[in-house]
């Protein structure tokens, strides 16, 4: 999930990760503020930060707070905005969306010590606290209510163990590298991610909100034969499942094929197949997701173009007839780095919700068609400061459309403005 995105430096880092020069969860995601502080805690002739780094570990995180205002008027009989399941603003208040703290040991495929030894171990422990936690709880780690993703918002701010996994990698010489990941991890699917620092906007696409899982628990293998190809394959307990399972021990196949022929192009196809419906292992749910990223050589490589296509099928998704349902989403992104202070981005999206299965704003069995247009900027006020460059704000304006009158105050459209502030450490 989320390997093909953002400004040129991050997009290039993603391409390097796909090429196998570093692992996808490598230390390129980290920020200096927390480690800088740990380096100032001395223990004898060394420091806490130095000892952590010497062991190959890194500690980092971020804080995000934001506000969304529905310009179409407050939704009737609701404190949330339609089409905003993830990150919706409860009661139109400024909210602490996420506090994230991560302890990770990345595996670097280009590390001479790893190549000489032929293997290495790593992992990640990632905790989340804030308003967003209630939307991403996995089944079995939902401490606040009976089942995952029921968005009860009680209490308003919650804790979630977002990722808990171990990794082991083997260098195969000229055949490349092979890594195994075991535990709970964010899904491969999706251009957008739970981590707001990897996204263009504060708000999320409809495909991210409704068309794919957030996390999965199981075993995932990653094979990198060369600098252009990466293959993923594994089995999980299913969409947003962890210690508990919503069906009789059903397993889901999760896979990806990624191809990066150059620093300008990145192609990937994600696949999820398996039983996801409550209480049954039949029929299956299938999602196929082609992702394309292009960084044209014009404009000094400051322009990033992305296409994210989601095609889904569930064999019993029609609540009215008990039959199948399909969904389709197409999200296009354009992001341009104007200078070190400012990045401008656009998102255009269409989403087809067959039989009302994924979004559910229509009457059960009734298909809905939706769209959103989002424009925003990322403002980094202190780009030259070692610590200040990690702070930025992202104002945006978003227009949502629906072919049924199911949006704010029973309308076919709604307009919202929003802004969030993020500090990474």
Where are the predicted features?
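N-terminal periplasmic/intermembrane-space "pro-region" immediately following the signal or transit peptide
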Residues: 1-78, 84, 111, 116, ...
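Outer-membrane beta-barrel pore domains
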Residues: 27-29, 34, 85-88, 133-136, ...
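Short loop/turn motifs that connect adjacent beta-strands in outer-membrane beta-barrel proteins
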Residues: 41-59, 72, 107-121, 171-178, ...
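Outer-envelope exported proteins of Gram-negative bacteria
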Residues: 56-64, 120-128, 179-183, 234, ...
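Residues on the lipid-exposed face of transmembrane beta-strands in outer-membrane beta-barrel proteins
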Residues: 61, 96-105, 163-168, 182, ...
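Surface-exposed coil loops of outer-membrane beta-barrel proteins
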Residues: 71-91, 134-258, 268-275, 365
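Glycine- and aromatic-enriched membrane insertion/assembly motifs of diderm outer-membrane
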Residues: 86-131, 332-344, 351-353
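Surface-exposed extracellular loop regions of Gram-negative outer-membrane beta-barrel proteins
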Residues: 103-132, 222-233, 291-298, 302-313
């Amino acid at each position: 999930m989320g390997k093909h995105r953002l400004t040129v430096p991050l997009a290039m880092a993603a391409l390097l990760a796909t090429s196998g020069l570093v692992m996808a969860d490598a230390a390129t995601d980290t920020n200096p503020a927390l480690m800088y502080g740990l380096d100032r805690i001395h223990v004898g002739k060394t420091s806490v930060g130095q000892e952590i780094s010497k062991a190959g570990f890194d500690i980092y995180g971020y804080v995000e707070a934001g506000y969304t205002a529905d310009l179409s008027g407050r939704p009737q009989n609701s404190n949330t905005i339609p089409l905003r399941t993830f990150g919706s603003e409860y009661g139109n208040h400024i909210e602490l969306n996420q506090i994230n703290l991560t302890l990770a040991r990345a595996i670097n495929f280009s590390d001479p010590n790893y190549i000489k030894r032929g293997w290495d171990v790593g992992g990640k422990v990632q905790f989340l606290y804030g308003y967003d936690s209630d939307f991403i709880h996995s089944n079995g780690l939902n401490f606040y209510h009976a089942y995952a993703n029921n968005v009860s918002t009680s209490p308003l701010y919650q804790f979630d163990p977002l990722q808990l996994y171990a990794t082991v990698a083997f260098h195969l010489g000229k055949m490349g590298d092979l890594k195994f990941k075991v535990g709970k991890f964010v899904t491969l699917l999706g251009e957008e991610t739970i981590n707001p620092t990897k996204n263009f906007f504060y708000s999320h696409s409809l495909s991210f909100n409704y068309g794919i899982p957030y996390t999965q628990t199981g075993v995932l293998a990653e094979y990198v034969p060369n600098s252009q190809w990466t293959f993923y394959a594994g089995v999980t307990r299913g969409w947003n499942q962890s210690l508990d399972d919503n069906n009789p021990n059903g397993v889901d196949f999760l896979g990806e094929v990624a191809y990066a022929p150059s620093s300008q192009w990145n192609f990937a196809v994600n696949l999820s197949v398996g039983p996801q419906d409550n209480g049954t292992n039949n029929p299956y749910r299938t999602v196929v997701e082609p992702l394309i990223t292009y960084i044209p050589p014009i404009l000094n490589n400051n322009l990033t173009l992305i296409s994210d296509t989601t095609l889904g099928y569930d064999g019993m998704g029609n609540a009215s007839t008990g039959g199948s349902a399909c969904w389709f989403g197409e999200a296009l992104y354009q992001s341009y780095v104007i200078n070190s202070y400012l990045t401008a981005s656009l998102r255009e999206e269409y989403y087809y919700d067959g039989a009302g299965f994924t979004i559910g704003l229509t009457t059960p069995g009734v298909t809905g068609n939706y769209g959103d247009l989002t424009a925003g900027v990322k403002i980094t006020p202190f780009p030259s400061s070692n610590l200040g460059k990690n702070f930025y704000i992202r104002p945006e304006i978003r227009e949502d459309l629906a072919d049924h009158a199911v949006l704010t105050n029973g309308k076919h459209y709604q307009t919202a403005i929003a802004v969030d502030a993020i500090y990474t450490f």
